[in-house]
Amino acid sequence: MTNQIKSYLTEQTRECKFETPVEIYYSQSCQDLFVLGVLNNKENGSYLELGCSDPVESNNTYLLESKFNWTGISIDIDTTKIDIFNKERSNAGVAQDASTVDFDDLLSQYDDNHVDYLQIDIDNLQATHSVLDGIDFDK
């Protein structure tokens, strides 16, 4: 079953065949369209983006924010990228190492305790595991 799901998602992503009302996407591999497809083109959703890099190009949350009125918090360790992010985007960009973030505290600072989409794009597996260990998914 897992291989069937992986195969389906790979094919959908390759062709970007998700049912969405938009013709343009910004993600490198259609992640933004995938989220919209899974969540039935949800408007006014919320995201937590860990590893945001560029605020628009190849960004997995820009479409959600700009066309579907999503709010969220984007975190990146690179302060230069976050400076650019905060000039280009209306949602919060935070310069911090995601593996050191207290996520409960961060979300409460932005009055956003519900996350529809958790986006993780951190460069190495060990850091990704560290981040996942720091998130209480039961809350």
Located regions from the model:
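Extended hydrophobic/Leu-rich segments
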Residues: 1, 5, 9, 98, ...
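Conserved acidic-Pro-Pro-aromatic motif
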Residues: 46, 62-63, 67-71, 110-139
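A generic structural signal for secondary-structure junctions
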Residues: 40, 90, 108, 133-136
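SAM cofactor-binding core of SAM-dependent methyltransferases
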Residues: 22-104, 124
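Residues that form generic nucleotide/phosphate-binding pockets
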Residues: 8, 12, 38, 106
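Membrane-proximal basic amphipathic "stem/tether" segments
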Residues: 1-23
